[in-house]
């Protein structure tokens, strides 16, 4: 029997990436070391990483027909990512961003043109055949619609034997109040350092202890804290930690968080423990920071 896929729902964007010696001053003109087009967006990047790790995966997000979408679809296919679930929109433009990567420290600065393109709706998601998937990951965006999607997965799972249930993860990355309702869904919830700090927490441990009451019974809450590594808290109340695995030289941090999330999901989907998944996530994300783009992470 063919292995079931991991579906990632969220953003795809065209990243136009300029690699520079140092971050430019305002009202100045500099030359870049190199420039490239790269498919980006959280859910899209996570698909790239899952595919590189060897997991069959699919992407669901919005695109509008045109040159940008042609490039993105071709790149998904080159990576072996299934795009049959894409929600094609008749209005709006496919999003793009300008990314500046500082070659001296790997820091990335992103200017996103988040266009008028509608996000994937619950109606779009109704058309998805859930039996194809063993895991569905949702990047928090239009949360009121995504709650309906998550409720549909829950309803589907109630009718399935344990081994056929779909596992669900949710990412709460942006500090927007609307997204916080997503904490209550999913077997695994990824909360970002940005959200944790926005809510007044000063460390991953503090954030996990403070936010665990918001997740559903039995869920695992995960928080990565950049160079300090990542922590996780599950229903047993035991705090788990993995140190970071920094590369010899940090060259590109664009997509490091998406790499971490995908690697944790991959590891858990393979039956590994939360501690093993946390460590694997930090290892792969660390390796990615030492590379331009994603090639070479495995």
Curated annotation (Swiss-Prot):
Keyword set, alphabetical order: ATP-binding, Carbohydrate metabolism, Disease variant, Kinase, Nucleotide-binding, Transferase
Chain residues that bind beta-D-fructose: 15, 41-42, 45, 258
One Pfam family cited in the UniProt record for this chain: PfkB
UniProt EC number: 2.7.1.3
Binding site for ATP: 108, 226-229, 255-258
Tissue: Most abundant in liver, kidney, gut, spleen and pancreas. Low levels also found in adrenal, muscle, brain and eye.
Coiled-coil portions: none
Catalytic function, reaction form: beta-D-fructose + ATP = beta-D-fructose 1-phosphate + ADP + H(+)
Activity control note: Requires potassium. Inhibition by ADP.
Database matches in CDD domains: Ketohexokinase (cd01939)
SUPFAM superfamilies: Ribokinase-like
Pathway in which this enzyme or protein is active: Carbohydrate metabolism; fructose metabolism
Domain of life of the organism encoding this protein: Eukaryota
Entry's Gene Ontology BP terms: fructose metabolic process; regulation of glycogen metabolic process; response to fructose; response to glucose; response to insulin; response to sucrose; response to zinc ion
GO function terms (MF aspect): ATP binding; fructose binding; identical protein binding; ketohexokinase activity; protein homodimerization activity
SUBUNIT field: Homodimer.
Disease affiliated with this protein: Fructosuria: Benign defect of intermediary metabolism.
Similarity comment text for this entry: Belongs to the carbohydrate kinase PfkB family.
Stated role: Catalyzes the phosphorylation of the ketose sugar fructose to fructose-1-phosphate.
Name under which the protein is recorded: Ketohexokinase
Organism from which the protein derives: Homo sapiens
Lineage of the species this protein comes from: Eukaryota, Metazoa, Chordata, Craniata, Vertebrata
């Amino acid at each position: 029997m063919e292995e079931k896929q991991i579906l990632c729902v969220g953003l795809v964007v065209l990243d136009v990436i300029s690699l520079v010696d140092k971050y430019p001053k305002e009202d100045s003109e500099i030359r870049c070391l190199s420039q490239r087009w790269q498919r980006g967006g959280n859910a899209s990047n996570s698909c790239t990483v899952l595919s590189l790790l060897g997991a069959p995966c699919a992407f669901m997000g919005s695109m509008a027909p045109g040159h940008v979408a042609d490039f993105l679809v071709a790149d998904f296919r080159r990576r072996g990512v299934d795009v049959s679930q894409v929600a094609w929109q008749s209005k709006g433009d496919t999003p793009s961003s300008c990314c500046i990567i500082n070659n001296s420290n790997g820091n990335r600065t992103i200017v996103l043109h988040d266009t008028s393109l509608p996000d994937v709706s619950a109606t779009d998601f109704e058309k998805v055949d859930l039996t194809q998937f063993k895991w569905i990951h949702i990047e928090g965006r239009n949360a009121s619609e995504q709650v309906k999607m998550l409720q549909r997965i829950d309803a589907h799972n109630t009718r399935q034997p344990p081994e056929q249930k779909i596992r669900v993860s949710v990412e709460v990355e942006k500090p927007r109040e609307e997204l916080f309702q997503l904490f209550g869904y999913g077997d695994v919830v990824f909360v970002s350092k940005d959200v944790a700090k926005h809510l007044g927490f000063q460390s991953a441990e503090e954030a996990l202890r403070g936010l665990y009451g918001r997740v559903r019974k039995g869920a695992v809450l995960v928080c990565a804290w950049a160079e300090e590594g990542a922590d996780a808290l599950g229903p047993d109340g035991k705090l788990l930690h993995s140190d970071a695995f920094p590369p010899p030289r940090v060259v590109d941090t664009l997509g490091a968080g998406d790499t971490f999330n995908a690697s944790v999901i991959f590891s858990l989907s393979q039956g590994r423990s939360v501690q093993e998944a946390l460590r694997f996530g930090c290892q792969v994300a660390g390796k990615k920071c030492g590379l331009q783009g994603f090639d070479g992470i495995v």
